[in-house]
Curated annotation (Swiss-Prot):
Any GO BP: intracellular protein transport
Note: Binds phosphatidylinositol 3-phosphate (PtdIns-(3)P) and phosphatidylinositol 3,5-bisphosphate (PtdIns-(3,5)P2) in liposome-based assays. Can bind PtdIns(3,4,5)P3 in protein:lipid overlay assays, but not in liposome-based assays.
Domain of life: Eukaryota
Basic and acidic residues biased stretches: 71-80
Pfam families: PX, Sorting_nexin, Vps5
Residue positions where Phosphoserine is found in the record: S32, S39, S58, S72, S188, S280
Keywords from the named record: Acetylation, Cell projection, Endosome, Golgi apparatus, Lipid-binding, Membrane, Phosphoprotein, Protein transport, Transport
Its job: Involved in several stages of intracellular trafficking. Interacts with membranes containing phosphatidylinositol 3-phosphate (PtdIns(3P)) or phosphatidylinositol 3,5-bisphosphate (PtdIns(3,5)P2). Acts in part as component of the retromer membrane-deforming SNX-BAR subcomplex. The SNX-BAR retromer mediates retrograde transport of cargo proteins from endosomes to the trans-Golgi network (TGN) and is involved in endosome-to-plasma membrane transport for cargo protein recycling.
Domain note: The BAR domain is able to sense membrane curvature upon dimerization. Membrane remodeling seems to implicate insertion of a N-terminal amphipathic helix (AH) in the membrane.
Topology of this chain in the membrane: Peripheral membrane protein
Protein name: Sorting nexin-1
Length: 522
């Protein structure tokens, strides 16, 4: 685009006529210099002054402006297109000026319009989908599939024992062999499923729900210990956590289509999952890779071009810290409520002993009734402690792990960006090497240098596409994750409030029933 100096007018700097310009246009240019400041018709409308302002816009300009307007939107936010024509053209001028600023072209808005041809406009990047569109897509991704995990069964004896769970699936989707089926799975099978899904989908920016954490102490008690309340509580927690994990997997449209998921749900016997033990060779290798990734992450300094990702990553990191603090407080609450239940039971026993030794019949009966009330209250405290743990603590624990996976998706996007930047740097070095060969007049090595440049140009293009694709996936995944998180927290908090309300109502009934006994003491 030919552009004059900052103080130069169109009449002082005339560009040469375009090759396809007809003689009549050249004659008009010679007769009226102010109107021939630019041979482009879009530029004419800008520089002709007041006379051109009243001139109606041609359909050609409208066609060239709409793609530029759509392509210049950032962060997936679209404006309504039900605007008047003059507003559209004014908005397009502003957007094109912003684009020219990003291209380091310090020109006037009118000349910015001249710099964009209809062909360039059609090649503009596709607009990002809006959050409303993403939510509509997620509403369409509702699948009629429910999974349940029941009947934890200990198989074997000693340290070789393991627990098998019954996985039941109910669905009307045609991809499955029947509407209802059940298989037996052990904990390592769930870990193996996660490893397979993570290996395939995490590198593309997908948020793969993580399984519950291993518990060496809990499983040791189950394997070698007797069946007691602590072992039963551990198995119930793990069963519920595995059910939530598997339900999140099948609720994800991409994960559900994965053949490993269908095999996990349908196949009677699975090959033994290897590398799931923490002290195995594969487990140690994973720990080493995680440490290496952490170090490499510290060395990457990404120049973020989209403020959405920067702000969202800060929100995720801050939320993870707050959830960890809240989880610690809830765990303390659970322990205190269990201690309260234990002390209430001791209090009830002491009251019963006191009532049995009391000579006053009315007082003895009242103390015995009070002991029974305290025993019922002890049961309420124990139930509420379990509700605190299952409905709050476990939910927070799930989302602490999920937020770590969300951060990993951002990290994977950063790695993809770094690979793109490294390829650009390598391409620049190859071009510099070619220039040195040209300068040194070494034609024998010049062809190889050109081939390498062609190869790295294709790599740069591919890596740029990979970065754009993973950015789109991460944006969509985070939007979906936040929506699911809101629904999940709402459901669990409502259930938790219902348990609290029920507990308080029962407590009031117990005391109301005991009140006549207390008044009857003479």
């Amino acid at each position: 685009m030919a552009s004059g100096g900052g103080g130069c007018s169109a009449s002082e700097r005339l560009p040469p006529p375009f090759p396809g310009m007809d003689p009549e246009s050249e004659g008009a240019a010679g007769a009226s210099e102010p109107e021939a400041g630019d041979s482009d018709t879009e530029g004419e409308d800008i520089f002709t002054g007041a006379a051109a302002a009243t001139k109606p816009q041609s359909p050609k300009k409208t066609t060239s402006l709409f793609p530029i307007k759509n392509g210049s939107k950032e962060n997936g936010i679209h404006e309504d297109q039900d605007q008047e024509p003059q507003d559209l053209f004014a908005d397009a001028t502003v957007e094109l000026s912003l684009d020219s600023t990003q291209n380091n072209q310090k020109t006037m808005p009118g000349k910015t319009l001249t710099s964009h041809s209809p062909q360039e406009a059609t090649n503009s990047p596709k607009p990002q989908p809006s959050y409303e569109e993403l939510e509509e897509e997620e509403q369409e991704d509702q699948f009629d599939l429910t999974v349940g995990i029941t009947d934890p069964e200990k198989i074997g004896d000693g340290m070789n024992a393991y627990v098998a769970y019954k996985v039941t699936t109910q669905t009307s989707l045609p991809m499955f062999r029947s509407r209802q089926f059940a298989v037996k799975r052990r904990f390592s099978d769930f870990l193996g499923l996660y490893e397979k899904l993570s290996e395939k989908h995490s590198q593309n920016g997908f948020i793969v729900p993580p399984p519950p954490e291993k518990s060496l102490i809990g499983m040791t008690k189950v394997k070698v210990g007797k069946e007691d309340s602590s072992s039963a509580e551990f198995l119930e927690k793990r069963r519920a956590a595995l059910e939530r994990y598997l339900q999140r997997i099948v609720n994800h449209p991409t994960m559900l289509q994965d053949p490993d998921v269908r095999e996990f749900l349908e196949k009677e016997e699975l090959p033994r999952a290897v590398g799931t033990q923490a002290l195995s060779g594969a487990g140690l290798l994973k720990m080493f890779n995680k440490a290496t990734d952490a170090v490499s992450k510290m060395t990457i300094k990404m120049n973020e071009s989209d403020i959405w990702f920067e702000e969202k990553l800060q929100e995720v990191e801050c939320e993870e810290q707050r959830l960890r603090k809240l989880h610690a407080v809830v765990e303390t609450l659970v322990n205190h409520r269990k201690e309260l239940a234990l002390n209430t039971a001791l209090f009830a026993k002491s009251l019963a002993m006191l009532g049995s030794s009391e000579d006053n019949t009315a007082l003895s009966r009242a103390l015995s009734q009070l002991a029974e009330v305290e025993e019922k209250i002890e049961q309420l405290h124990q139930e509420q402690a379990n509700n605190d743990s299952f409905l709050l603590a476990e939910l927070l624990s799930d989302y602490i792990r999920l937020l770590a996976i969300v951060r990993a998706a951002f990290d994977q996007r950063m790695k993809t960006w770094q690979r793109w930047q490294d390829a650009q740097a390598t391409l620049q070095k190859k071009r510099e090497s070619e220039a040195r060969l040209l300068w040194a007049n070494k034609p024998d090595k010049l062809q190889q240098a050109k081939d390498e440049i062609t190869e790295w140009e294709s790599r740069v293009t591919q890596y740029e596409r990979d970065f754009e694709r993973i950015s789109t996936v991460v944006r969509k995944e985070v939007t979906r994750f936040e929506k699911e998180k809101s629904k999940d927290f709402k459901n669990h908090v409502m259930k938790y409030l219902e348990t609290l309300l029920h507990s308080q109502q029962q407590l009031a009934k117990y005391w109301e029933a005991f009140l006549p006994e207390a008044k009857a003491i003479s």
